Amino acid sequence: MVDIIDKALRMGEGHQLKKLENVAKAVNALEDEISALSDEDLKAQTPKFKQEIENGKSLDEIMPEAFATVREVSKRTLGQRHFDVQLMGGAALHWGNIAEMKTGEGKTLVATLPTYLNALEGRGVHVVTVNDYLASYQSELMGRIYRFLGMNVGCIITEQKPPERRKQYNADITYGTNNEFGFDYLRDNMAWEKADLVQRGHHYAIVDEVDSILIDEARTPLIISGPAEGDVTRWYRQFAKLVLKLTRDEDYDVDEKKKVVGILDPGITKVEDFLGIDNLYEPANTALIGYLNNAIKAKELFLRDKDYVVTQGEVLIVDEHTGRILPGRRYNEGLHQAIEAKEGVEVKAENQTFATITLQNYFRMYDKLAGMTGTAETEAAEFMNTYKLGVLPIKTNKPMIRKDQDDLIYRTKKEKLAAIVKDVAKRHAKGQPVLLGTASVESSEVVSTLLDVAKIPHQVLNAKQHEKEAAVVAVAGRKGAVTVATNMAGRGTDIMLGGNVEFLADAKLKSEGYSPEDTPEEYEKRWPGTLNEIKAQVKDEHEEVKELGGLYVLGTERHESRRIDNQLRGRSGRQGDPGESRFYLSLEDDLMRLFNTQLVAQVMAKGMEEGQPIEAKSVTKGVRTAQKAVESRNYEIRKNVLKYDDVMNKQRTVIYSERQAVLKGEDIHKDILRFISDTVESYIKGANKGSEKPKDWDWEGLFKALNTVIPTKVDEDEVRKIVGGLKGAKAVEAVRDLIVEDARQQYGEMEETIGETGLRDLERRVVLAVLDRKWREHLYEMDYLKDGIGLRGMGQRDPLVEYQREGYQMYNSMIEAIKEETVQLLFHIDIKQVATTDEAVDEVEETAESADTIAVASGPDENGESVVEAAEGEVEEEDEDTDAKQAIAESAAASGAGESTLPVAGPAPISHAEGKVPVSKRPKSEELKTPWADGRTFPGTGKNAPCPCGSGRKYKMCHGQNEK
């Protein structure tokens, strides 16, 4: 199916490329005219273009002259002139496509064209990079073009506080990483004050290394969370010790391909004996199974120095695609805690989700989206299906002459590594630069050790040395350089033969004390001379390295994705330079062992001799087959993640929009009055027991429960007399009108006491508090639902359809609870006892936290943390910049109707189950035997988890009360 889509997509490429060529011709036709302009005339182009846009001209009409202007400014400030193919790439980006341009073709410079053009509209342009260093470096270097033309340039980096972030977002052009942009969006939707907002919309984004961000990281949702209730760290430590006593294949099974484990009968017996329990699979022990599975996964599937490193007592995840450390990220669902217990470091508390969004849904919010990469064509169908982005391959400026050799395959890793060292020694002896790509930190260190033994000087670039990656990559093309890199971690910095001129010039100026931030004028003044000086130094060495064959790229094993391999190969042969690449494989490599057992068997049958490799097209083809199988599986995972997130996205999109309206001061008084009416009607319907006759209603229960929400002054006997002759809907309406009228009168008295302005502010802040709290609980329940929804497939039901259906029901129930709790809090605050609105809100919070009718999970402390959690045991990412106020506000979701600025339930308000008063509001009866009256406890169960007894209550509200 994907192949058919690929062919269909390519059918229109010729027409698109012709349009791009026409743009390049139009820009070239203006070159002489623009080149003749003075610096002042060039600077005047920006206000001229803005005026033309205001007068009705489209960006497409302005594009040729705007591109020509940027090209001329680039020549004057950077000494770089955009090639025709770069002009074509710029047009492709402006029209909302992915420009596939090979490594070394100057993608960073290409982005300046559409970035400037779209920034003229004054709505902001976001340029998205893969790490903070590149965001900072590119904003400095390319910012010289923008600043010359009168544009403001901002850069978002991890350490910045909200006021600084707001300033950066208000710039015409803002650089930053995908995670920073995404987290700021989530934090904005947790803010309690308009002044706390930092972003100003999502107009146009250009994503650098778009395949890495929108494909490789698409399985990883961004999540802001804080510590959950309860301390269960002892269970992780206990199970870490327990699994050391278990034996693989005897006590448990491991499927490395699918990354799943299964406990066998002998293992179950050992676990039960160790824990002193009779039956591991009793409902009371449900939580223990999760600890056991995670402990086995930590032991067998997650390896130190491959999947993670341990630094200063902390477990840090290594990105499987780039080899970089992912600071602050954590595996989800208790897996990270299991690894911490395995390594004997501090086991940190589990987290509870406050706000979440996938990268897929975040980037689909932009009015226009574009991207750049050297390797997108293999995923063209996915880009179109998910993001509506076409992929346009842009030809290279000079013909590619790199030699890509067939793979060499050896029997064992030991034989392969010996051959690699021999090959590197030969290349190094003649001075040819060599780049060795490895798939893990562990592998890079093994190769480094062997090179040390062979006395071959080299640089290592892996997750443990990620701080110096750009500096190492910048000199990796110099004569005699040998660089060992994990999955080519330094993407974004070109490997130029002889050295990277711009990087070396920038480094020289900074070493002399000049920088764009601190001394911008001196930096600009000295840049041309320093650049020419470095160019002269590099030129001779560049020619010498070309004569030696250019950069030799040696892959020590194949990655699961063809794109990662192509990215490694793409480091060589830039801008028409010579180069060579080859991959060394062994039958023991993970890809071969797990995904192509048939090929391994065929090769073994040929009776390979020790140290003797096989070099054949069939081997390379077999590897590609294995890679396609993995890519197909990963694509299905990403599609599945998106399908499930789309359910939440519909709720999240509406409520975030409505929440922003409340935050920005819209009057919600009418909504509060509607909340009062809806809540009263819901209680009446819950008390009528399905009977149309008022005499059969539970009047005592109704007024007792209703008074916990609205302390009504209406007399029960009087109401019963008034509705005595009415039936059905008319009776409900009559009772509702009487109680609502009384409630409105009380509410009016409240307004007289606190003042109209004070009450409006109180309403806004109470609504935000309740929305955020209920949304947090809703996220928790939705996570729990998703965790177990796959089992519905065993009952011949579609898990996704079930998730949509039950998620919608839970969502509507949440809306009812939001209305009810908002009304309850507003009516239970003692306005006469508080002097200010702030004090009133404080009392509201205290009331909310102490009332036994409202379930409030604990939020983060003053150092609230944000995390990127992932589906299927991917990763989480922390952000310690969340301040205390944001940490309290835990995001909300709901649905809107008409012009209302607050959530309402769907087409028809959902009534409470079984025609009764809501569970949380029913009168407590001394005679009623509670589920937890049997005195049992269920060790290891989280406080917010459903109680294993089956009552449907959270553990802390059920048998958890028996814990001392």
UniProtKB/Swiss-Prot annotation:
May bind 1 zinc ion per subunit. It catalyses: ATP + H2O + cellular proteinSide 1 = ADP + phosphate + cellular proteinSide 2. Residues 848-964 are annotated as: Disordered. Transmembrane segments: none annotated. Its EC number is 7.4.2.8. One of its GO terms (molecular function) is ATP binding. It is found in: Cell membrane; Cytoplasm. Zn(2+) binds at C947, C949, C958, H959. Keywords: ATP-binding, Cell membrane, Cytoplasm, Membrane, Metal-binding, Nucleotide-binding, Protein transport, Translocase, Translocation, Transport, Zinc. It is a peripheral membrane protein. Its cofactor is Zn(2+). Pfam families: P-loop_SecA, SEC-C, SecA_DEAD, SecA_PP_bind, SecA_SW. It comes from the Bacteria. Residues 889-900 have a biased composition (Low complexity). Residues 871-882 have a biased composition (Acidic residues). GO terms for cellular component: cell envelope Sec protein transport complex; cytosol; plasma membrane. GO terms for biological process: intracellular protein transmembrane transport; protein import; protein targeting; protein transport by the Sec complex. Monomer and homodimer. Part of the essential Sec protein translocation apparatus which comprises SecA, SecYEG and auxiliary proteins SecDF. Other proteins may also be involved. HAMAP family: SecA (MF_01382). NCBIfam families: PRK12904.1 (NF009538), secA (TIGR00963). Part of the Sec protein translocase complex. Interacts with the SecYEG preprotein conducting channel. Has a central role in coupling the hydrolysis of ATP to the transfer of proteins into and across the cell membrane, serving as an ATP-driven molecular motor driving the stepwise translocation of polypeptide chains across the membrane. Belongs to the SecA family. This is Protein translocase subunit SecA. The gene is secA.
